[in-house]
């Protein structure tokens, strides 16, 4: 069974978006900016809050982790916590405090974070900070941004993430330095892939046009390095499945469909059931106003899924969350001079609707 399996990989894990390389290509300016601010901790000072924004796959997470890894080589006094902040304020707080998720109130959890911060200066990296802000994350930022020993580093795909903060008290205390990441260009993506290829693959197993093609296709997807890495990884999987000793251009083109399916699977996996049903309502109605979606959601919930109806306010919040995940698009349509605007919700134009509907059906 395994004897005939081609040995293409030296280390497949290198192609994972979770892998943090020893050096970074084409992000020297951003590395310099982040390290300049966080470096104040080496002088005994609390670094200023940071907000790092840019499109998906632009290197925000890997660059921040790289700087953090380097910082930890120079200090043992700092308390550094990295979390994906995609839950409620309470859930995010328990992750930061490393506390159990039951039995303690929110303010008790905040007090435990204060205790951790009292051990030294504390840097809290909150990846996908927009996700918790779309829920009740203001509440947590209110407390953390007022702690003299705490530096918050927020990462977001949403350029207007600060507009999500509705509490004026938070706005006055959380005034981050902003660092923006531009999408990668095709040459930059090619450089990133070539660096990883040396560590990931055995010699001579990629045809010459494989890396340039992956880079070009990813550049068309808003310069998404994760997409480029997924394409290369999936193309190699296809070659192995077909018992080929070399990855070809045709494998890359076949991989585009598999990467799309995997993206949809991951997207659905992170949703709660009410979000899945709401997305299903948007997809099957081909869009509509929030009121129209609201009626369809409640009808579907009662007739097909046996769940509970939502208030229109809660549904609007869920629609905003789906927009943050890149699964729906919310268009603002004018009603004429002096008559205000309407929302119009449509499925994301970048996602295959049939694949998405099938994935939702399987998950419910």
Swiss-Prot record:
List the molecular function annotations (GO) for this entry.
Answer: ATP binding; ATP hydrolysis activity
Q: Which keywords does this chain's UniProt record carry? A: ATP-binding, DNA replication, Nucleotide-binding, Plasmid
Q: Which HAMAP family match?
A: ORC1_type_DNA_replic_protein
Its function, per the record, reads:
Involved in regulation of DNA replication.
Tagged with keyword Protease: no
The UniProt record lists the keyword Ribosomal protein: no
User: What's the gene?
Assistant: cdc6
Top-level lineage group: Archaea
Q: Would you identify the family this protein belongs to, as annotated? A: Belongs to the CDC6/cdc18 family.
**Residues that bind ATP:** 58-62, 184, 196
Quote the NCBIfam families the UniProt record gives: orc1/cdc6 family replication initiation protein (TIGR02928)
GO annotation terms (biological process): DNA replication
UniProt name for this protein? ORC1-type DNA replication protein
What organism is recorded for this protein?
Methanothermobacter thermautotrophicus
Among the Pfam families in the record, one is: AAA_22
């Amino acid at each position: 069974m395994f004897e005939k399996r081609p040995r293409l990989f030296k280390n497949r894990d290198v192609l994972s978006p979770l892998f943090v390389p020893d050096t970074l290509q084409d992000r020297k300016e951003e590395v310099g900016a982040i390290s300049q601010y966080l470096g104040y901790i080496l002088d005994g000072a609390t670094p200023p809050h940071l907000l790092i924004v840019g499109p998906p796959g632009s290197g925000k997470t890997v660059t921040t982790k790289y700087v953090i890894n380097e910082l930890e080589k120079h200090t043992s006094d700092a308390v550094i916590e990295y979390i994906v902040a995609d839950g409620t304020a309470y859930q995010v707080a328990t992750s930061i405090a490393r506390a159990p998720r039951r039995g303690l109130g929110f303010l008790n959890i905040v007090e435990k974070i204060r205790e951790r911060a009292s051990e030294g200066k504390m840097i809290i990296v909150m990846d996908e900070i927009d996700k918790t802000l779309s829920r009740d994350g203001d509440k947590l930022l209110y407390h953390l941004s007022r702690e003299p020993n705490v530096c918050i580093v927020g990462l977001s795909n949403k350029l207007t993430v600060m507009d999500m903060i509705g509490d004026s008290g938070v706005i006055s205390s959380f005034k981050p330095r902003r660092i923006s990441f531009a999408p990668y260009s095709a040459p930059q993506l090619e450089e990133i892939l070539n660096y990883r290829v040396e560590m990931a693959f055995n010699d001579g197993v990629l045809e010459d046009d494989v890396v340039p093609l992956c880079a070009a296709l990813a550049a068309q997807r808003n310069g998404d390095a994760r997409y480029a890495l997924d394409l290369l990884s999936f193309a190699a999987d296809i070659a192995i499945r077909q018992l080929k000793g070399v990855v070809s251009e045709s494998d890359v083109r076949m991989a585009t469909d598999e990467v799309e399916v995997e993206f949809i699977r991951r997207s659905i996996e992170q949703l709660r059931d009410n979000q899945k049903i709401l997305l299903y309502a948007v997809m099957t109605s081909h869009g509509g106003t929030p009121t129209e979606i609201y009626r369809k959601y409640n009808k579907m919930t009662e007739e097909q899924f046996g769940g509970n109806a939502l208030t229109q306010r809660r549904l609007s919040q869920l629609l905003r969350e789906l927009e943050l995940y890149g699964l729906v698009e919310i268009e603002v349509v004018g009603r004429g001079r002096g008559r205000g605007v309407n929302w119009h919700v449509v499925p994301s134009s970048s996602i295959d609707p049939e694949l998405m509907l099938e994935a939702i059906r399987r998950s419910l």
